[in-house]
Swiss-Prot record:
Cross-referenced InterPro entries: Orn/Lys/Arg_deCO2ase_major_dom, Orn_Lys_Arg_decarboxylase-I, Prn/Lys/Arg_de-COase_C, Prn/Lys/Arg_de-COase_C_sf, PyrdxlP-dep_Trfase, PyrdxlP-dep_Trfase_major, PyrdxlP-dep_Trfase_small
Superkingdom of the source species: Bacteria
Statement: the UniProt record of this protein carries the keyword Cytoplasm: yes
Protein EC: 4.1.1.19
Protein's UniProt name: Arginine decarboxylase
Main localization (coarse): cytoplasm
Any one biological process term the GO annotation gives: spermidine biosynthetic process
Subcellular location(s) of the protein: Cytoplasm
Record pathway: Amine and polyamine biosynthesis; agmatine biosynthesis; agmatine from L-arginine: step 1/1
GO CC, alphabetical: cytoplasm
Lineage: Bacteria, Bacillati, Bacillota, Bacilli, Bacillales
Pfam families: OKR_DC_1, OKR_DC_1_C
Amino acid sequence: MSQHETPLYTGLKKHASRQPVQFHIPGHKKGAGMDPEFRQFIGENALSIDLINIEPLDDLHAPKGIIKQAQDLAAEAFGADHTFFSVQGTSGAIMTMVMAVCGPGDKIIIPRNVHKSIMTAIVFSGAVPIFIHPEIDNELGISHGITLESAKRALTEHPDAKGLLVINPTYFGVAADLKSIVELAHSFDVPVLVDEAHGVHIHFHDELPLSAMQAGADIAATSVHKLGGSLTQSSILNMREGLVSKDRVQSILSMLTTTSTSYLLLASLDVARKRLATEGRQLAEETLKLANQTRDRLNQIEGIYCVGSEILGSKAAYSYDPTKLIISVKSLGLTGHDVEKWLRESFNIEVELSDLYNILCIFTPGDSQNDADRLVEALTEIAQQMSEQDVTHQQTEVLLPEIPLLAMTPRDAFYANTEVIPLKEASGRIIAEFVMVYPPGIPIFIPGEIITEENISYIFKNLDAGLPVQGPEDSTLHMIRVIKEQKAIQ
């Protein structure tokens, strides 16, 4: 088949055009049985293909027809041996690849700045995480990837590891030397798993970091919806045969996937793949041009710093994605969250994320020159407002806490006997739940780590700044769940 074809999307439209009488779910029956206002808003075309896995439309859990054809075309487009569609988001795809290689007690080497879905998979599987400290950018206050040297030390100390997981690229667009890391891991017969949630587009332009499949990785969870043009919650899992079992991946993915798979999501993956495969390079070229022009303009604004190629050069920053605009605002004396709120309220602009020091803006083929102009105008205005204030402000100091020590496996901690105590009194105790700022969803604490005063202070610093700290059962974070201490019987 040609990359210009869309077997799944075309098959759905053909089926809908026959207007069959539906005595099956979904109960809205092409919109006829739902609220009229919502039906009008969504549109009849979309509702006509909101279908289920009846025989003519194939089954994601055992694809043999139009879904298999669409997945095969995706594998060809991404240079994979096999591609699996996911309607459980990239989180579902990530959990699948971890659980496909790890069982209870198995070691997996991972950077500590992983997404919560990876740690969730480790809890589910019972795997033992071997953490690599990611390289820290103390100027920006963000984590990069892992270095070749740290990966080599981890593999040398733990040659029995069942997998090495790499983030490529990071949320902020920075990539390590993935090809060399893959070659190193393969010399130990260890498969490389890649969290490629923020890199679906990098496969299609040579000025972007190498994709997981280009670097020779064994399996990669790739988020098409984030930057590739499909609908939210749709993703793919690319893999190469050899160190990872295709049948095992299919089995685990099926276990984690709803039986009511959304054909709207699946169709959007099919058409997004077609556009990436046939127009991806040109689309990336135009996006890179707009992003780079915007970066140059932002760097003319006093107090604003938009990161460019100067971020490269460290061992963990081998290449980067210029379509991610990391905008440091600490010289304004404001937090990233302050600026995010101001952009929303004053210019109706929404950013991808903010932290204590930065905002992150993502450019895709969906952005226009007018959008870029508005961002530049807005940041020019807030910088001018800050410079005109009579009060002197100090540049925000970047503070990043040490990574906590892991005292027990995340699974053991998650299922242990626990109690709830005030967070302010929890220093020295072993935490039994996740604490993270979302986005990006990178844990401050994971179950099994020892709570420190430094990390408690960091949590309150994020809360005081208005950032979304999530994870604990107590959403106010006044209380935290910890492992119950076993006291001797008197």
